Amino acid sequence: MARHGEERRGGMINATIEKFGYPATLVRDYRHWVLLVRPAQVTAGSLILAAKGEATAYGELPADAFTEQGTVIAEVEHILRVALSPDKINYLMLMMVDPHVHFHIFPRYRGARSFAGLVLTDHGWPGPPDLKSAVELNSTAIVQAVAAFR
């Protein structure tokens, strides 16, 4: 596990990033962001896009983080389309339990999808994601999920 405050590519790894399983869940590392597999899969391919550093409000991020975010989102949507062909992609920024700036990315599906050795159903479709239906990934499934997006 990373040490809190560990320096990575120009930014700091914070407690929220660690809570979502970093470094085991790391898919991509950017200057201002990390893309992680969400250890509790609400829908197949659920991800976390977390800002590096200690910002706890979206407006506290440096201007460069917003610029980079456009590139990151384009890459996220591409890897999800290639790997899982979602019908929609939802982005939720809650930050009520985990305080640092981060987004939950939920690919949405009309039907079930196979992912990381599991068959997952989007229980909230066509409404909001059903966060209570999340399936915890074990370490083997996390490795498979990360590999699916590399």
How would you name each of these model-derived features?
Residues R8-R150:
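HIT superfamily nucleotide-processing domains
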